[in-house]
Every structure is written in C-alpha cells, then in structure tokens.
A protein has these predicted regions:
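Positively charged n-region of N-terminal signal peptides that target proteins for export
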Residues: 1-4
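Bacterial N-terminal signal peptides
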Residues: 7-18
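N-terminal hydrophobic targeting/anchoring segments and the immediately downstream early-domain regions
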Residues: 17-188, 237, 241-408
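Distinct, well-ordered alpha-helical segments
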Residues: 152-156, 217-227
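Short, contiguous, pocket-lining structural segments
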Residues: 186-193, 209-214, 246
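Alpha-helix-loop-beta-strand connector modules within alpha/beta enzyme cores
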Residues: 187-202, 221-229
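Substrate-binding cleft of carbohydrate-active enzyme catalytic domains
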Residues: 197-210, 214-217, 250-256
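His/Asp/Glu-rich metal/cofactor-coordinating catalytic motifs and the adjacent surface-exposed loops
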Residues: 223-233, 237-238, 244
C-alpha cells in the first residue's frame, strides 16, 4: 500500500512538473512575442482614419468607443507607424477632387501637430525609425485613387512635396487613366498617360499602390515602374476569390521585382465562405447602402457605421458567417509559402472595413506577432512582416527617385 502511495505521489509530481513546464513554455512564447512586438516597427499601410477626423467630433488623442484607431489604442497595440489614407469618392473628379484631397492632407498635418507629444509626420524610412527611437508614432499619408490628381501630372509633385508617399492608381471605379478591379474595363489597363503617371511617381518618391486595380492595370504598372510595387491593402485570391485580392501569379511577379503585399483584414477579402454568403445577400445590401447614402449624404463615417451595423445584423441572423482573426495569419502564411517572408506585411484597412472576430481594432495587433511566433516564424522574419519589408521598399523608392531626378 505504501509503495502504491509513493508511486501515485511520484506520478502526481511528474505530471505537475510536466504541466508546469508546458505552462512555462507557453508563457515564455507569449512573453517573447510581446517583447518582440513592442520592440519592432509595426507599420500598417492603410487606415481610413482621416474620414473620422473630417467629422470634427473625433479626437485622435482620446480612446473612442467606435472605430479602430486612436492614439491610446495604437499605444496599446504597439502600432507605431501608420499610413493614413487620403480618400475622396471616385465620382468626384477634377478640381473639386484635388481641393478635397488637399483639405484632407492639411487636416492630417494639423492633427499630427496638435498631438506632437505622441505623433510625428514621416515621409521616409529614416524618419519612421527616428520617430520610433523617440517613442513617437509615425504618421504617413497615401492617396487612395488616381482621380485625385485631376488628370494633371503636376499634382504628383505637389502631393509628394506635402508628404504623400503612395498613391493607389484606381479605387472602386475606373479613373480617367487606370482600370479598377471592381468596374467594367474601360482602358485595357493603364493608358499612355497612366504609364507616365507611374514614371512620375517613381521620380517623385511616391510608391505605386496596386490595391483596387484590375489585373491588367497591375501588370502594366509592374512593367513600367522602376520601383517595386506595393499592394497597400489586399489579400490572397486563392483563399477568397474576390477580384480585389491578388492571384498567386500576381503575388509571384510582384515579389520577383521586390514588391510587398499588405494583407487586408476586411472579412469579404479574408474568407471565401463569407464572400459567397455576402454575394447571396448583395442585392439587399446594395439597396440598404443606397438608403444609407441618402440618409448620410457625403458623411463616409455615417455610411460606414450603417454598413457595419447591417453586416452585424446579417451575421446575427445567420445570413453571414463569423470570420476569425486567424484568417489573417492564413493569408500571411500563404504568401510566405509562395514567395518567402520578404514580400508580405500589414495593411488592415482600419476605419474603412469590417474587422474579423478577435481583432476588433488596432489594440489587438500583438495577437498577430504571437501567432506567427507559435507557427515557428523566426523573430527576424516577423520583424520584416510587421514593418521591415515596407521600409525596404521605401528606401529603394527614395534611392531611385534621387537617381531619376539627378538624371533630368
């Protein structure tokens, strides 16, 4: 009997020890992930936060009950470099689009100045690193839609001088010189003028963003650009077969020329199940969206809130499936398996998309680092994905821009 008691005690002790080792190991990974995340430059290439600034009631410096981005949540999530999107609807063209874009740029710059204790305007990789060393959040700007140059190539120089560092060639609609992925083809990709736009962007140190564009526009831009392309907020078509996403061939040729695709967190682009279900209710959604536009007018934040409420109602009613934040990891992993860890990063579409369950805002970003670490990614590769890859492309762009300007 005594032997049995001793034996049971030994087993209990061994199991307790084993359990302790496992817990310690799990805690060690969590601790390593947190240390890695908060010591890295975490650079997201697309947030529509300026639309919230336009309301005049949103204070970037205070934690907000709505939306995805504000300074307190950026601090909590270790998000220390963010591209703010300058967005005007593609139905506004010419001088009005230019003026509205300039107003948004000015608004972003004002907010950075207003919150100078926490924020710093950045236009290149060196300035991002400097802000990080100072404990500040680097704010950058990208223009979402080539219609905002108003068919005037000189506006690229103006926007670049004001600190804009990328431009998406088209948005949901075709513009005057580039086809969109979600509109009927009008130009067979890029027009001659569109190709000149890409060359001028190279010259002015403005990254060429191929999110939203048609496949033909993408291949045209790839052929013309001397600087690696970026997809500021796109996901993998092999996982969710949406035209906004990139095919495996597109990812391969993008990577072959040094480019980077930044994964979008929008449910429609993350999950094929969700995309298919959404397509089945698209007619109802379109009718409701028209209703929202009538009620909200030009207030994109109002429209966005109404759309998110509608999607939550449809999910609650079982018409749309839930989408886990872990789909983001699936998309990242697909790109890494396809072309390696040097060509993928984070392009959330915060404040402009419906986030997946478990990653409701930017405060949840450390989950991504921990998940990648648990999958066996090296710390070096995780740092690349968090921001290092896009910093590399920015440095290449700056170098090529100087060479092109010197050759003029």
């Amino acid at each position: 009997m005594r032997r049995m008691v001793v034996f049971l005690c030994l087993i209990s002790c061994s199991c307790a020890g084993l359990f302790f080792v496992r817990c310690t190991s799990a805690d060690d990974i969590a601790d390593r992930a947190r240390q890695l995340h908060f010591s890295s430059i975490v650079l997201d290439t697309h947030a529509d936060t300026p639309q919230r600034l336009l309301t005049g009631t949103f204070d970037l410096g205070k934690r907000d009950a709505e939306g995805h981005v504000d300074i307190p949540r950026m601090r909590e999530g270790g998000l220390n470099a963010q591209f703010f999107s300058i967005f005007i609807t593609g139905k506004t063209l010419g001088p009005p689009a230019i003026q509205l874009a300039l107003d948004q740029i000015d608004l972003v710059r004002q907010n950075v100045q207003q919150h100078g204790k926490d924020l710093a305007l950045a236009t290149n990789a060196e300035e991002i690193r400097r802000a990080h060393a100072q404990g500040k959040i680097a704010i950058l700007m990208g223009i979402e839609g080539g219609h905002m140059i108003g068919n005037d190539i000189r506006m690229i120089r103006v926007y670049s001088a004001l600190g804009v560092r990328y431009m998406t060639l088209a948005h949901f609609y075709n513009d005057e010189w580039a086809d969109s992925s979600t509109d009927k083809p009008a130009h067979n990709g890029l027009t001659h003028f569109g190709k000149e736009v890409v060359r001028e962007m190279n010259r002015q140190d403005m990254l060429v963003d191929i999110s939203h564009v048609s496949d033909k526009t993408f291949y045209d831009a790839l052929e013309v650009s001397r600087v690696p392309l970026i997809a500021s907020h796109s996901s993998v078509r092999a996982i969710s077969n949406h035209p906004r996403n990139m095919s495996d061939d597109m990812i391969k040729v993008l990577a072959a020329k040094g480019g980077v695709m930044q994964i979008n967190y929008e449910r429609n682009y993350l999950s094929e199940e969700y995309r298919t279900a959404f397509a089945a209710v698209a007619g109802d959604v379109s009718r409701m969206e028209e209703k929202f536009k009538k009620e909200c007018g030009d207030d994109n934040v109002c429209i966005g809130k109404a759309e998110i409420r509608l999607e939550k109602e449809l999910t609650g009613a079982g018409k749309l499936p839930h989408v886990s934040w872990e789909k983001i990891i699936e998309h990242i992993d697909h790109v890494v398996r396809l072309v390696g860890p040097d060509h993928v990063g984070l392009g959330s579409d915060f404040d402009g998309a419906d986030m997946p369950d478990g990653l409701e805002d930017c405060s949840k970003l450390p989950k991504i680092t921990e998940a990648l670490l648990r999958k066996g990614y090296s710390e070096e590769d995780i740092r690349k994905i968090l921001g290092g890859n896009i910093l590399r492309v920015m440095e290449q762009s700056e170098k090529i821009s100087k060479e092109m300007q010197a050759a003029q």
